[in-house]
Amino acid sequence: MKSNVFILIFILFSIINLSFANEQTKKPQQPQQQQQTTSPVNKLEAKLFAPNDAKFSSYRVKLRDINTFNEIVQIPTKDGIFSFVNMSNGLYSLEIESMQYNFPHFKVDVLGKNKIKVRPAENETSILPLPLQIKATHRIPFFQQHVPFSIFSLVQNPMAISVLFTCALIFLLPKMMSFIEQDEETKEALKASTPALVQQLPEWPTITQKQLENKE
C-alpha cells in the first residue's frame, strides 16, 4: 500500500511540473504589425573626395534656397558622405565650406517628387549624375608664401617711388639753384660790360641835312 501511495504522489508531482513547464514555454501570439517602409522624398546624396589629410567632420555643407535665402547646414561623415531629404520644389545653391580645400559650387533644381537636377554653378548646361561626387579643386594656402627680394618690386612699390623722388629732389635742387645763381652773375657781368663795349666802338661821322642839301 505504501509503495502505491508513493507512486501516485510521484506521478501527480511529475504531472504538475510538466504542466507548469508548458505554461512557461508557451508564449502568447500577438499580431505583428507590418511597418510600411517609406523612402524619403527628394533626397540628395553626395560624397566629398579630397586627399587623405582632409578632415570632413570639420566641413560645413550649406544648401541655400535662392528665393527665400533659407539655409540648411549638414556636417559630412568621416567618409565625406552627406545627404539632404524632403527638399521642397525650388532652386538651391550647394556650397562646401572648408579651411583645407576648395570645392566647386553647384545649383540644385528640385522639379518634383524625386526629380532633382544638379548642375555646376559655372556651367549650367551640363547635368551631373546622382549620387553626386564632389572633388576638391586645390588646397587653400593657410600661410602666405614669402616673396623674394627683387629690384623690380621696389620700382613697383608706390612708397619706394615717392622716397626715390624725394631723394632726387634733395640732390638736384642745390644743383639747380647754383646754376641759376651762376646764370644771374653772368647776366650782371654782361650788363656791366655793355657800356664799355659801346665806348670802344669807333665814332662814325654823322651827315647833317644841310650837308646833304649842299651836295645836291
From Swiss-Prot:
It is a single-pass type I membrane protein. The keyword Hydrolase does not apply. GO terms for cellular component: EMC complex. Its main location: membrane. It holds the Pfam family EMC7_beta-sandw. It comes from the Eukaryota. Residues 1-21 form the signal peptide. InterPro entries: EMC7, EMC7_beta_sandwich. Belongs to the EMC7 family. This is ER membrane protein complex subunit 7 homolog.
